[in-house]
Amino acid sequence: MPKMKSHSGASKRFKVSGSGKLMRQKAGRRHLLEHKSSRVTRRLDGVAVVSPDDAPRIKRMLGI
């Protein structure tokens, strides 16, 4: 049986932390930032943990 291919789009968007959690970037901080407050842009920086409901599907896409 051939090897499973990981979903290349998912592999660019999600990383696995040291403890095994899936990490993602928050949406809404790429462009059109001029009208957003500094408070909002600060809230959107950093990484977030993927929802437990979405994690199994994403793990399957990553081949984990």
Curated annotation (Swiss-Prot):
Q: Output the Gene3D superfamilies linked to this UniProt entry.
A: 4.10.410.60
Q: Which GO terms describe its molecular function?
A: structural constituent of ribosome
Q: From start to end residue, where is composition biased (Basic residues)?
A: 1-15, 23-33
Q: Which UniProt keywords apply?
A: Ribonucleoprotein, Ribosomal protein
Question: Quick check: keyword Ribonucleoprotein in the entry?
Answer: yes
Q: PANTHER family from the entry?
A: 54S RIBOSOMAL PROTEIN BL35M, LARGE RIBOSOMAL SUBUNIT PROTEIN BL35M
Quote the protein name from its UniProt record: Large ribosomal subunit protein bL35
Name of the gene: rpmI
